[in-house]
């Protein structure tokens, strides 16, 4: 007589179908700043100094820093309120000053071109990197505590008693870095693994720096000035960033639409460019085509080592570093505006630069657009969530316009052509930040910031 086995086969869990998947819904949460309209900014030039030029989360998401055209840096604390992120004003200071080049007789403004913040391992200190046109500064914001005692030995000898502790937030400059060969600085990025190292880039060079080094840049691995010194090959570096998955790898993009992966381990003295990412199917080669293909920004994921995303004027390209000849996916940003290309060119709107951010998993990508609209792309479900920021209409600010993206990367409807003339190209979102460890967005509109929380809502289908 055979005994029946008591071991039962494990039932495999069914794979989630499209109807089981849920959509991330983004809800407006907080507003910070003093509202200004585009007309007020255009009318009074002094208002332009308050325009935000860069924004960055700390790696541990404890703080967020904001830089503006006036050289100021504003620090916000990221606190928890009812289980959600909430920003609180902490401190602000003047980080950059005007600079004058004696040899070229050129005055450079104090505008913050790029910034970054060190992880806050010492909770009493906040170390911040900021760059103007030609100067990089390392500042430390700290809390200075002073003990205040009662009047000692006023009448008779006694042990002094502590009355109170006076706390004051101060800032001091720890280091100022300059380089004679500097062109206009366009990038500043910390190494996520070796936090005393960072990189910067200008039009023709990428510099690697060490905070602890007494000298200037450790070395200059990328120099394309000689290659670009031609009337027919005016290639310039537009953005550079360390990867979020390897301390030895960084990327830089150019105005020709090329993204290059650089591995610091390939050569101890001179970098070897191992990978070129360029969309070979792009057949636009005129000056307007270069502006459209120019790399505005680059982002990488902490978890997916093969994932690289780049923002261009009309689209986002998703790259797999194992496939170099073309992007694996392309997402179009407001496709109908291509029909107004001549208008955009003659009004200099093609010079607008848009940022790109992604969450730690690389599942969601955040970018801005015109008409005060920002987009959150769901990579897995191929969805484009569009939200318009309108301070006069709270209901509109909480309205998630969700569109399915087709195989060509488009979520275009014919009715969009009717709305094209209603788009205000002066109202644009170019700067934003994605919290490193939660579904929390910070969106910049002129001199104000708006925050959004993401929660899984209704199912797809």
Sequence positions of predicted segments:
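WD40-repeat beta-propellers
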Residues: 73-78, 136-142, 150, 206-212, ...
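Beta-strand-rich domains and repeat architectures in extracellular enzymes and scaffolds
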Residues: 41-73, 111-114, 119, 186-188
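Loop/turn-rich, solvent-exposed surfaces of beta-rich toroidal or solenoidal domains
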Residues: 301-318, 322, 345-400
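Conserved beta-strand element within WD40/beta-propeller blades
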Residues: 64-67, 127-132, 197-201, 250-253, ...
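Inter-blade linker and blade-boundary elements of WD-repeat/beta-propeller domains
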Residues: 6-47, 81-111, 138-187, 207-241, ...
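Loop/turn segments within WD40 beta-propeller blades
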Residues: 55-61, 116-125, 188-195, 234, ...
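Blade-level signature of beta-propeller repeat domains, shared across WD40, Kelch, NHL, RCC1
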Residues: 430-461
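Short loop/turn segments immediately following the C-termini of beta-strands
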Residues: 68-69, 78, 133, 203, ...
